[in-house]
C-alpha cells in the first residue's frame, strides 16, 4: 500500500494543460530517440495528446476521468469505466516524482475492490515495453491478445458463491 495518500476528483477544463504535460512526460523517453528538434517533438506530442483525448471522450463517454491529487497537488490521471460486463482501466499516469511509491498499486487495489464488488473482470491495454506491464502481471492480469502495438490484458473476477452455484 502507498505511504502517499491521494485523492481523486473529476477532470475539469482547467486540468487540460496539466494532463497534456503529463502525456508528454510519459512519452519523453520514447521521443528522446526520435532525433527530432524540440519544437517538432512538442508539436507532435500535442497532436497525439489531442487525438488521444478526443478518442477517449468519444469512445468512453460514460467513463470516470479523474485527476489524482496529493495534498492538493495534481500528480496524475486515472481513467476508468465500470460497464455491465467488464471494468476498464483506460489510462493511469503519474508524474515521475510520484512513480514507484505504491500509488499505482493502491489505485489498482481500489479498482479491483470495486470491480470485485460488482463481480466484474477488469481489462486494460498496455504497450509491451511499458514498466507497468510487470505491475499488472503482479495483480493477476493475463495477456488475452495483442492488437497493434498493445497487449490486451484481463483479470478475471474472483469466483463468488452465487456464480459457483449456477
Predicted regions and their residues:
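Extreme N-terminal starter segment of soluble prokaryotic enzymes
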Residues: 5-7
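Acetyl-CoA-dependent GNAT
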Residues: 13-14, 21-90, 95-96, 108-110, ...
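Conserved GNAT acetyl-CoA-binding A-motif
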Residues: 115-127
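Conserved active-site tyrosine of GNAT-family acetyltransferases
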Residues: 56, 136, 141
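Conserved acetyl-CoA-binding loop-helix of GNAT-fold acetyltransferases
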Residues: 100-113, 134-138
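Active-site acidic-Proline motif in GNAT/NAT acetyltransferases
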Residues: 95-101, 128
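Surface-exposed loop and edge beta-strand positions of immunoglobulin-like domains
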Residues: 9-11, 125
Amino acid at each position: 500500500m502507498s505511504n502517499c495518500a491521494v485523492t481523486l476528483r473529476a477532470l475539469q477544463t482547467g486540468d487540460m494543460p496539466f494532463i497534456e504535460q503529463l502525456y508528454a512526460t510519459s512519452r519523453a523517453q520514447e521521443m528522446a530517440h526520435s532525433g527530432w528538434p524540440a519544437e517538432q517533438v512538442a508539436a507532435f506530442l500535442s497532436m497525439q495528446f489531442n487525438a488521444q483525448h478526443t478518442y477517449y471522450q468519444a469512445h468512453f463517454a460514460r467513463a470516470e476521468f479523474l485527476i489524482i491529487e496529493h495534498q492538493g497537488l495534481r500528480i496524475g490521471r486515472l481513467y476508468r469505466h465500470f460497464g455491465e460486463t467488464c471494468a476498464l482501466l483506460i489510462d493511469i499516469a503519474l508524474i515521475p516524482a510520484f512513480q514507484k511509491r505504491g500509488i499505482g498499486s493502491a489505485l489498482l487495489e481500489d479498482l479491483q475492490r470495486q470491480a470485485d464488488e460488482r463481480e466484474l473482470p477488469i481489462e486494460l491495454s498496455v504497450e509491451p515495453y511499458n514498466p507497468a506491464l510487470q505491475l499488472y502481471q503482479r495483480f493477476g492480469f493475463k495477456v488475452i491478445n495483442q492488437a497493434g502495438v498493445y497487449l490486451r490484458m484481463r483479470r478475471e473476477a474472483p469466483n463468488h458463491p452465487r456464480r459457483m452455484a449456477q
